[in-house]
């Protein structure tokens, strides 16, 4: 019954990782300016229609979620859509470091080609070391504790709408972060942009 409503086992990648790269980030979670380091990851949200997968891209400088996407299945396209949203929103120069775990979506040829085409530098956590991507995972933890609270949404559209509300109406513009001087990510960037001019 669980498989019929989309709650089968979590998809697993068979075979060894193919596109592994070094851990360039090396837990340096404090870049000096925006668009130097982005971290990305995927989580899942329960609905009565089955899973809703969320891919998010965070700028480590301010902890702002700069790109995100949702989908009913966990595919390479999901992570590419989130990264494309970040590129569209931020329009960074070349050389942005994009850090992820070693999931098959991030080791895929499509992901690596996308990064190369947009002059981005790939970085990956070491295998089995969740602390290497701890900041991205802490965002998902906050989302689940502060908004989802173990609820099961009636459908994927409702869940996606709530994710939008949390990220765009609360997390980025309002939620305070100790790493951002006790202000929201949007406010942190605004203050530092004014201070730099």
PLM regions: where:
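Charged DNA-binding/catalytic regions of mobile-element recombinases
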Residues: 1-197
